[in-house]
Amino acid sequence: AFVFSLMLSKEVPKRFFPDSDRPQILVYTQLPAGTSQREMTRQMKGVFETLNDKELFSNIESFSGYVGFGGPRFVLSLAPEDAADNMGFIIINITDIEEQDNSIEKLRITLNDRFPGMFFRVNKMFLGSSDSSEINLQVVGPDSDVIYAKAQELVDRLHKIPGAIDIRTDWQNRTLKILI
């Protein structure tokens, strides 16, 4: 029995926390750095109208959206993103968790098609300290021009990987950000 259980352990997914069983989808939105909160609010109203379209999204039960900050910390493991006028966050409650993956894909396609100047990151709710589907890479060095060029090379290479989505840098419009 012990040997058999060791053999079966290879089939168990290797992750610290399982996927969340909450029927929720998280949508992170972003416009280019320097966009006013008023413009972000205007764009988000358009997103809300799209989400309210029951013919398009019949499985959306409700949603809450936030502009200028990453929303409240409604789950201990979810750390909101830093506040910025060009950022938004939406929590979507869906009626059927079995349709979550299809809903995420439909949201990605629809939102990106309808709002071409806006960036969307659409994910399922996660457990643990970070989203297990997300990979962060860091490019460091003393020369900002070289760092920027290398980061763009890396982005170009990542775009060639089948199934890779939401590839971006956090160097918004090459805007310097100083945190004190």
Give the location of each predicted region:
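Solvent-exposed, membrane-proximal periplasmic/extracellular interface segments of envelope transport
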Residues: A1-F2, R38-S130
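Transmembrane helices with small-residue packing motifs
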Residues: A1-T35, F119-K124, E134, I161-I165
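Beta-strand-rich non-transmembrane domains
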Residues: Y148-I180
